[in-house]
């Protein structure tokens, strides 16, 4: 078997770093608001360390090792000592700093966008040399060597099952033990449905106990099994296996989260914020998902806060079963000017929903107008920083209480800095350079509010339906609806691993479809010729992402998509290519070297609108009715990467990879309490600045010992041979 292409798994030394600036927005806060934001940020940063435990068996040790390295001395001293030793070059040290940055930016050694492994871009012996000449090693050689020996091989391993996240022998995950397969996931899913449990805040451990297969569903909480407070349920026999629901996952880290949420509560601006934080604390303390749902309800009702935040086990993209949430937390300040535009969009939402192509019976009975704000991010912890969010993800709350939309205003322009658009004509490159930021703002606004915020799920609870089973007609069959969500079903539990890419595709299509509306473009400050250019750029950018970027996130070996948004955009491109009439074309202009994407802008409002509209009807009908089989068949067809025909994407992938640009890493601020106010620190937009920001983020080495103890607790489930104790390092 050929060796894997290292460029797919490394961050190059020229990786760009950009500052996520929010100084003006933060400095405009009162002292009380700054303290509120600071303690929420601390809770988010501590909680973000949970992601290392959720990513791979070795990730907690990698964090502990690199955190010891960068806190024992300055980056400049680390660099100077390594180079002067003669055992490492300046390029070697740069490669290490970029690797460290990649680990910290993704909260683990797998990319948050794409799920592929991150390995150092320098030889193992050179990295070891830098570690052994460091101040951290001089201070405690036994601890550093113990950590290095425990994770060095895993850091560099690119065995097939280590290259990407996934089940069992096909990938790496810590949401499940390695002996779990898709069948195990389905069995556990059925058990959880029967006993009304959801997967957001748990992991699954499978082992033998007294000769019987046992599935341990371990809930995230501060409290452990031995604590007196009553817990969920006793051991249960289901399908001949023992099911054991326990708690105490990430206990020490969640204790730090709760301590900071308690402090933040002292500076809350109203009862809704206090009640929200109280419920989050209860959830993280006890493992109760209902408490987090309650906190989310308070959060939705807290309209237009000056400091916005959300925290918990949220997005399910990286669970191979699509049910378990990765921890994330964000803190941000409202951008009033941009928020006014989103407020106007919300005011028009009900009329815009009527323009969507599915029948009104497939739309929610009542549109609950959400809070929609543009935010300047102060803190975002997790495996990546999105451009926009539509939360909470709990189906029952979204249908009955509503949701919130946030556009991360300082993320959007930052993400376009220094970017080159390949595979386009010079005229289209100029169009993207001029209008891409505005077009993306339009797309994000529509995607979050009316994409994720639209559509009804048909449900049956007992003998009651939430739709008229006698009169509602399926537009694809012209007959009555014959499928729906039963009691205990959620979108995630039914659509599982398909769910994320499918829902992102639906939201992206809504954004494209409604970007044709002149009133929408006017809300975003564009009219006339400029509005037409923004509309064209919105479509061009989506189709460019589907053709020029998406296949970076596809694995030919496993024939598996590694990233939901990338798969969604590729599917949209295929739908538009299928529409014909020379609406969209991709040609190989230089054999094996270059491609050209062209979009006939005169046909967007005709051919393009019809193609996306017809596709949207199918997407929504299958989602509303829970028709996973039809959804899977359709989506798999458009997701196929073929190596023949008019568009040999499997062959063209090598051309796309040859033009690949490194993904940016965003440098965030730190805050620190000084008396009755809070100081904010900024850092250079470099690898050195990024690493420095992390070296100053936590006030003690306690986080290292907590992660090491969590690794030790789980090690027996993830290693064939019991690893060495880390007592020397703890």
Task: Describe the residue ranges of each PLM region.
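N-terminal-proximal low-complexity accessory segments that begin disordered
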Residues: 2-77
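Active-site recognition of the HExxH zinc-binding catalytic motif
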Residues: 30, 270, 439-461, 507-508, ...
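A generic secondary-structure signal for well-formed alpha-helical elements
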Residues: 44, 69-73, 265-268, 272, ...
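Long, well-structured alpha-helical subdomains associated
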Residues: 51, 490-505, 509-622
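Short, glycine/acidic-rich hinge or "gate" loops at secondary-structure transitions
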Residues: 79, 83, 271-278, 461-467, ...
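Contiguous, non-catalytic segments that form substrate-binding/exosite surfaces or channel walls
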Residues: 97-101, 106-224, 228, 239-440
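Post-HEXXH active-site segment of zinc metalloproteases
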Residues: 455-503
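Extended, compositionally biased alpha-helical segments that mediate assembly or anchoring
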Residues: 596-730
